[in-house]
Amino acid sequence: MASGLGSPSPCSAGSEEEDMDALLNNSLPPPHPENEEDPDEDLSEAETPKLKKKKKPKKPRDPKIPKSKRQKKELGDSSGEGPEFVEEEEEVALRSDSEGSDYTPGKKKKKKLGPKKEKKSKSKRKEEEEEEDEDDDSKEPKSSAQLLEDWGMEDIDHVFSEEDYRTLTNYKAFSQFVRPLIAAKNPKIAVSKMMMVLGAKWREFSTNNPFKGSSGASVAAAAAAAVAVVESMVTATEVAPPPPPVEVPIRKAKTKEGKGPNARRKPKGSPRVPDAKKPKPKKVAPLKIKLGGFGSKRKRSSSEDDDLDVESDFDDASINSYSVSDGSTSRSSRSRKKLRTAKKKKKGEEEVTAVDGYETDHQDYCEVCQQGGEIILCDTCPRAYHMVCLDPDMEKAPEGKWSCPHCEKEGIQWEAKEDNSEGEEILEEVGGDPEEEDDHHMEFCRVCKDGGELLCCDTCPSSYHIHCLNPPLPEIPNGEWLCPRCTCPALKGKVQKILIWKWGQPPSPTPVPRPPDADPNTPSPKPLEGRPERQFFVKWQGMSYWHCSWVSELQLELHCQVMFRNYQRKNDMDEPPSGDFGGDEEKSRKRKNKDPKFAEMEERFYRYGIKPEWMMIHRILNHSVDKKGHVHYLIKWRDLPYDQASWESEDVEIQDYDLFKQSYWNHRELMRGEEGRPGKKLKKVKLRKLERPPETPTVDPTVKYERQPEYLDATGGTLHPYQMEGLNWLRFSWAQGTDTILADEMGLGKTVQTAVFLYSLYKEGHSKGPFLVSAPLSTIINWEREFEMWAPDMYVVTYVGDKDSRAIIRENEFSFEDNAIRGGKKASRMKKEASVKFHVLLTSYELITIDMAILGSIDWACLIVDEAHRLKNNQSKFFRVLNGYSLQHKLLLTGTPLQNNLEELFHLLNFLTPERFHNLEGFLEEFADIAKEDQIKKLHDMLGPHMLRRLKADVFKNMPSKTELIVRVELSPMQKKYYKYILTRNFEALNARGGGNQVSLLNVVMDLKKCCNHPYLFPVAAMEAPKMPNGMYDGSALIRASGKLLLLQKMLKNLKEGGHRVLIFSQMTKMLDLLEDFLEHEGYKYERIDGGITGNMRQEAIDRFNAPGAQQFCFLLSTRAGGLGINLATADTVIIYDSDWNPHNDIQAFSRAHRIGQNKKVMIYRFVTRASVEERITQVAKKKMMLTHLVVRPGLGSKTGSMSKQELDDILKFGTEELFKDEATDGGGDNKEGEDSSVIHYDDKAIERLLDRNQDETEDTELQGMNEYLSSFKVAQYVVREEEMGEEEEVEREIIKQEESVDPDYWEKLLRHHYEQQQEDLARNLGKGKRIRKQVNYNDGSQEDRDWQDDQSDNQSDYSVASEEGDEDFDERSEAPRRPSRKGLRNDKDKPLPPLLARVGGNIEVLGFNARQRKAFLNAIMRYGMPPQDAFTTQWLVRDLRGKSEKEFKAYVSLFMRHLCEPGADGAETFADGVPREGLSRQHVLTRIGVMSLIRKKVQEFEHVNGRWSMPELAEVEENKKMSQPGSPSPKTPTPSTPGDTQPNTPAPVPPAEDGIKIEENSLKEEESTEGEKEVKSTAPEATVECAQPPAPAPATAPATATAPEDDKAPAEPPEGEEKVEKAEVKERTEEPMETEAKGTTEVEKVEEKSAVDLTPIVVEDKEEKKEEEEKKDVMLQNGETPKDLSDEKQKKNSKQRFMFNIADGGFTELHSLWQNEERAATVTKKTYEIWHRRHDYWLLAGIINHGYARWQDIQNDPRYAILNEPFKGEMNRGNFLEIKNKFLARRFKLLEQALVIEEQLRRAAYLNMSEDPSHPSMALNTRFAEVECLAESHQHLSKESMAGNKPANAVLHKVLKQLEELLSDMKADVTRLPATIARIPPVAVRLQMSERNILSRLANRAPEPPPQQVAQQQ
């Protein structure tokens, strides 16, 4: 026999049996047979999914020699030093274990090792060495040194010591030792290369191992020899499986010696093998190891492999073949064995194969780490592994056939087979027995997983101990023996689900034959007892519950492995489940006694969890006839979906089967006129014959029924009089062709009236249908019941369920014709000519849209939509799809026709009669003023024919009343703790300036609502809560934790004693969980419904609760899920545990009890936690209730429902002050009684009073109002507002959104201290060390707070950033006396603020500002910047705004500024609070505000020096002319300075900083905001001064004048709080560059050096400016020179006037050089007025402040700024004089604007201590510029010499010029690259080291009040 293809294992001389035992200690862990059933547990996740098939060599098998699994492992472990020496070894047993056994086959061992052993192992080694040599010839691996050299890496110079060779005995240990050494030398080595080097190193290490001949080797040799000797006992037999049994002489069944802990050490030879027939021993091939190629592509399996697969597939089909998957339906075909091919190879061929080395289709990388190297190959799939990557890792390669962990898990085992495509065929050795057969049987007993003598099955690989069989066998049987698995009967079908299991009866015992030599007197041996086995009760796929039956465990295990495993996992398999399925034992016992049939069914089915309904026919859907003429019926079972319908034969015994067959044929006959029916004649059954409806109408529908017709009497029901009236009205409307809305109040039986209406149409011959009813899924069961009761002759189909159910309904219930609808799960159109089988189709809203294909293809006689407010939005898909259906008549049912507004009502009417109601605008316009009587009458007339609405109060005069009481409850101490904690934790979100948004506030409200309900709703509290052993909360602690539960406990006790029953509603399902625990603790029985409980279960719970004598005392419902179509009239007390946001949901909820059938007074208790968000929500809900019904609001229907941020903030504040006050007064303790009279205590008396049912309702007014709003008409009731109408304006205004006055600092004051305390505690607890507290100027804060509180009328939390300068300005001077109100304006206090959003005459108003006024306001902002604090008295108030009160104006300014600060896309249509944006561009507005604030600040700085008149001599003239005082501003030409602005002399240090901020923001277009004022305030002055001294580049011309003011200016107080302005972006070009480069300019020296180049970008931008400036200069000079003579006198006067003005732009603009030149010219020529210079610039800015941005004409016309006209006087006669003048002013202003921005940047740079970054590209530009300058200056003389004709100088000059040119072109290139570097400027937030939120909140803060002396000056 040829050996394997690898190198041999070294072996030593003798080896004893003890050696084999010793090997047990070294072996791989055994494959855990005890885990056979679930091998997943043995393997890591990663190994499971990768399965790939590989080819294996074949080896003959012998079943007769016993084998030991563990010994096989030992042998494997001892073979060879390293993985590369191990060759593929044979696997000897086939595994066909459906349980997924981990059994791995191994080699056999003979009891005695013969003397030939050593010789054998030597010859084996020799042969293997030869083969290895051949292998090496073909592919010699490189040494590690060669590999490293090839890759250019360093080798390690470690010399292995003797100790190393002793300790590093396996690859893993070696790898762990050597790998770090290699990595240290070559840190960047790739993993794949590392693996190759390690492999090579290990190979060398193993080869050089001096100990390899000793113990380890001898062990291996012993193992090899042992195996060889074992092989000598193997006899070859025929490969093919045994043919079908024939008559043969009796022989013993097959046995074998299995492996395992109990296997015998020295087993005897098998009795079936004659000693004479021992074949020659075979050699053991070691396991295959492959050295994977690195980086090679993963191979796909070869084509031969595919061929084999095909072949094996054919073979597998044969009856006699067996495979791994025998008995396992879930096995994949890939795992089947590839059967051997019959061909044998010749020896020569085999040798050739050996020379070639083996080629496999294995992957050449490790499955786990995906790297190559030395890998061992799996024999049952193409995977390969490193030994160290296995889990657990192998120390030595296993010998023989080895399956990888994946195959072990999948249950795939190696099977011997021929594989001639791979050239690995192994021939039998000469002299071998051709009959020899491989033993494919399991090595372990299938039952106990142990070894020993095993009985082998003749047709499958299973083996058993005879004592493990059930019943046990006394001895090995004779002849062929089939195991239990092979004799296991097949299942009768596919199992759908396992219902239950039980222990079966043990099989009858096996008699033990008396031994022949036994004493005849001894008693016969005791028969062997069998064991009871599990029996499983299963439901079969496609069969009804009638066919459920018991199957054995083995059957399930074989045929439904996955299902069986899953069932085992989920259920206790030791103790069978009890048979009690919630039925009432007492009742069922009584019934069993009376009804033997029931007793039988109980015994067979019901006790095992099958409900009686599932075995009752609901209806027969269809029939079919088979070839033999037998009829089968498709039956739909009660309470089961359609996909559980099953075909049953006509002669099956089923209760009422004949009745249903009869009704099926009756209906068929009725609809199709068919008489004949196939099959047996039906038995006569008493069944009311269906009457065919008349062909033509028999009754005039317009005639009223005085009493109900006979066909209704036949149903046994009686309609109420008002229902008869409803029926008459519906029939009348049908006759008139009027589509209708039945809007009766909830609980008046709209469903019944509708069913009766449809039934009357059918019975009277008006229509046979089909009728379509669309209802909420939860109410469909109720609809079914009502139709069953009131319309028994109608065929009603419920079209709901999953795809499968609906497909069955479509195929069988839509039409009698087979091909009317295309089959399949996708709905398709129904054929036009096909007749419809049903009369009524009930379906849900969703399916109307999902299955519109089929439903839309049917012509419906009538559509009914239940809960029709689903149609209130004409944009919904439901509305649009339903509109496309073919509908002859429409009826809408709704209990709340006017749930929100008139628009929704219009949509309902539009759906009903689109031809009449199609113009929404017209409709809304017509009824815009619904408050007027005639309008209401008109609307009622219009609605009259379409709507009918009755109230319970109208129709049930004797119906018990209902009383709703609001029960105020206290917070428990624990709730108070959490309430405070939630508020404190969310301080940032609550604080108006902290940037909280609507969502975060809503989250806070929800948390507080949870806290009011129960603190255990928070995970933290739930974790800490004391629990009982069973996991439920401890009852007393649960109750103590919540004020509501404390009260509920007392109430329920009294209610229970009084015999009342209670419904408890909560919005939160988790609260319902807690209530369940509470009720369990109190011992009350209850039912529960929430959103997770669907139709059937829901109805069952309701039925149980409503059943007479039901024990359930409480019913827990979730407000929304329990709100629709549920009748719980047996309860008379409703407790609303927490109120819903939407009051309609609460009304829906308590209407569950207050409805038809109620005979007791209903008490409704609404729990409301006092002084909490709940109390406020209840108030808001009441207000909403009144609004929704009293105020008809056209408008954004669906959007109006959500809470505004304002409402949320208001809700959150409610009660908080008191809560935190408690803390202060009680010292943190609980409220003491008597301390606070407002605390509510419920003692017994109070509870009695509360539960007294005679008390009158105290707080139900809003509900009465709601119900009475329809009292005037039975049709379309509408309500008039009861408030008396104010002035006309108020009447017309429709409030869309109200804005309330809010104290923005409420949270700041309330929570700041708590919050900071909490933060400190957190920091301390988290161990972050002591926190350095941020310095907070509390003084400033308190001043700001006071301002905000006193004056800010409308600052609300609708904005993340909620501050505006306008307000600040007003507020700073709030103490100063205001101007009295003008005519036409009421006093602020008299008139409340207008609502935030309102609609007046179709136009939207914002805080009372209409579109024109809003536009005017925006224009004023763009003209003047921020409104000053006295805007009310200045030019600021344009004509359009004069009608506004000061309060309104301030409120609007505040709102406008908050909108500017609100982040968001400019494209949005509205701001966060719903105010329309109207195309407002924040960027432009902020830019303008910023520029104007800079100008205003600059003018104020020098105003006290320069006065108010540019040419003071004109002042007197003007005074005389106009008789007006310059001090008091006229509306047109007001004072330049706004009184609020700081006087320039005041050395208040804050201003620059503040304005710095302004621009900061401007400068960065990120609208993020600027640095915090407070910090800036403190340090800015110094910074500014520092920056201010150097910048003026012309100290000569502007000596003290320039710098002194500059110094002065630094501390000047900024104008009114223009922090917002900061956001404005001033000049796009200069802005950002300045910002960046400003960093570089902080150092004073730099600035002095003329750091113009520092800010290269600006310089670049300024090139344009320079050109402009030069032009301006020309114009100026020309202009200046012409009028010389005219202005001499003026100049003399002027020279005496004191003047100061400077802009410290650091030389970054041309301004100072211009000023220098201009002033020089002006001084020389004495034309101070005529030549434009610094003075003119100041007055230009002053004019802009007074007249507005770019109002050049107004400025020129103002005599105060006459100086600006002087330079242009000479040009007056030119045609384009005005154009020249305006262009010049505009360009000059641009330059000033730029300079102002730079000045601000420099101040900030200084303040922020920015330093130059030498690596910045602009610095390179700076050095280049210095080079240019230096080069130019040092060679100035050359030009003169060159001009003088000096030729050498000329040549040098050319070179210098060339150098200059190069330098300049380099600079130009650098400049073009600069913008890219600018783009990387960090955002404002980063540069300010502040978070965006802090910046925004800073912006929202108002500026501090000026110091007292300043205020005095202002006044």
UniProtKB/Swiss-Prot annotation:
Ranges annotated as biased composition (Basic residues): 106-124, 333-346
Extent of Low complexity compositional bias: 317-332
Pfam family, one: CHDNT
EC number(s) stated in the UniProt entry for this protein: 3.6.4.-
Catalytically driven reaction(s): ATP + H2O = ADP + phosphate + H(+)
Gene Ontology annotations of biological process type: chromatin remodeling; negative regulation of DNA-templated transcription; positive regulation of DNA-templated transcription; regulation of cell fate specification; regulation of stem cell differentiation
UniProt-annotated stretches for the region Required for interaction with PCNT: 1570-1915
Sites of Phosphoserine modification: 44, 296, 301-303, 312, 421, 508, 524, 1202, 1301, 1342, 1363, 1524, 1528, 1530, 1563, 1569
Compositional bias per record (Pro residues), positions renumbered to this chain: 506-515, 1528-1537
UniProt cross-link Glycyl lysine isopeptide (Lys-Gly) (interchain with G-Cter in SUMO2), position: 126, 139, 172, 290, 297, 611, 689, 704, 1205, 1221, 1232, 1297, 1521-1522, 1558, 1565, 1577, 1609, 1620, 1639, 1646, 1650, 1663, 1673, 1690, 1868
Annotated Helicase ATP-binding domain residues: 731-915
Motif DEAH box positions after renumbering to this chain: 866-869
Residue ranges of the region described as Disordered: 1-150, 236-353, 503-530, 571-596, 1337-1394, 1518-1694
Zinc finger (PHD-type): 363-410, 442-489
Cross-link type Glycyl lysine isopeptide (Lys-Gly) (interchain with G-Cter in SUMO1), residue numbers: 704
Swiss-Prot/TrEMBL keywords: Acetylation, ATP-binding, Chromatin regulator, Cytoplasm, Cytoskeleton, DNA-binding, Hydrolase, Isopeptide bond, Metal-binding, Nucleotide-binding, Nucleus, Phosphoprotein, Repeat, Transcription, Transcription regulation, Ubl conjugation, Zinc, Zinc-finger
Gene Ontology MF term list: ATP binding; ATP hydrolysis activity; ATP-dependent chromatin remodeler activity; DNA binding; DNA-binding transcription factor binding; helicase activity; zinc ion binding
Sites of N6-acetyllysine modification: 1646
Localization of this protein: Nucleus; Cytoplasm, Cytoskeleton, Microtubule organizing center, Centrosome
Protein name: Chromodomain-helicase-DNA-binding protein 4
Lineage of source species: Eukaryota, Metazoa, Chordata, Craniata, Vertebrata
